[in-house]
Amino acid sequence: MAAATTTTSRPLLLSRQQAAASSLQCRLPRRPGSSLFAGQGQASTPNVRCMAVVDTASAPAPAAARKRSSYDMITLTTWLLKQEQEGVIDNEMTIVLSSISTACKQIASLVQRAPISNLTGVQGATNVQGEDQKKLDVISNEVFSNCLRWSGRTGVIASEEEDVPVAVEESYSGNYIVVFDPLDGSSNIDAAVSTGSIFGIYSPSDECHIGDDATLDEVTQMCIVNVCQPGSNLLAAGYCMYSSSVIFVLTIGTGVYVFTLDPMYGEFVLTQEKVQIPKSGKIYSFNEGNYALWDDKLKKYMDSLKEPGTSGKPYSARYIGSLVGDFHRTMLYGGIYGYPSDQKSKNGKLRLLYECAPMSFIAEQAGGKGSDGHQRVLDIMPTAVHQRVPLYVGSVEEVEKVEKFLSSE
């Protein structure tokens, strides 16, 4: 508050907020040899100079030190707009991610109502991998595809449930390429166990341009070229877990952020920032039912986890059977998730584009690691849209440990 000068004895009025934040010191200048007051009971009218002095004891606390209100929520939409304002992402990416979050909300509702709406059980068809499609697999794929098409910002979409990538109609077409598994762990639906959706976002490949006069076969080939990019090219990746809470995990290359769906407002709210995977952990997540089919080196690794070791305690086994659920626990608690190759699945079971690359990108952004047992997953150049690879992902020390066993003579 600037110094103020008055020439009358009129009182100086302050608002309650100003009065609480400051006190007034008034200095009355006197001429040499004169008294402050002239005569008895009669005040002179000297110039009065008043200055506000900040009372540090009663001043409000700085914003950083102020306790955050329980109603001061940062929604996914608000967070995305902030990233756009700061130049981290562009407007098109904001719209694509918002469309994906909308699809996840719809799928979450379908999953919760599946037994009521008779959406459990199989559809009666198989997907391109020869797997029986659940009813919710088909519906979730349609929901995801429609949300991405109507966003007007995607050029090519590739789903685990579709034979080939699909070019979005020109009237709705955009630039981004989105790969996704609409409902991971759908075999758990009938038992109401955690499921999830996984996605990754790429820019178009420089080698691929679809001309206006391209034939259907040419468009398909160009779509495949566009989609078959290494995970190191990912611009964003994430997953949504449908469990006791609906959790949306996202990275745009600046760390991992966790949003939780608030059923009261129907919005994803930021609940964790810059998540970091512990450097090591004492939890392993493998389907040990396939132990007899594993390589001897992998068997030795698994046996080592069950020995007391230096800590005096063996590792704990935790396996849900849903990649999203098992990975989310691994990310928070540390440890390792693995789905290796075996005699039955020579190249592993998980898809590189839709599952392994996005999860490995998230893991690395959280300070972890993703490997196929011999090399970084994000460095693998896809040779087919539905290519499968082994996956070991989680804490850096745990992934490096299994790599040492697999590379031993």
Swiss-Prot record:
BP GO terms, sorted: fructose 1,6-bisphosphate metabolic process; fructose 6-phosphate metabolic process; fructose metabolic process; gluconeogenesis; reductive pentose-phosphate cycle
Compartments in which it is found: Plastid, Chloroplast
Pathway(s) annotated for this protein in UniProt: Carbohydrate biosynthesis; Calvin cycle
Top-level taxonomy: Eukaryota, Viridiplantae, Streptophyta, Embryophyta, Tracheophyta
Keyword set includes rRNA-binding: no
GO cellular component, one term: cytosol
Top-tier EC class: hydrolase
PROSITE patterns named among the record's database cross-references: FBPASE (PS00124)
Pfam families noted in UniProt: FBPase (PF00316), FBPase_C (PF18913)
Name of this chain's protein: Fructose-1,6-bisphosphatase, chloroplastic
Induction: Light activation through pH changes, Mg(2+) levels and also by light-modulated reduction of essential disulfide groups via the ferredoxin-thioredoxin f system.
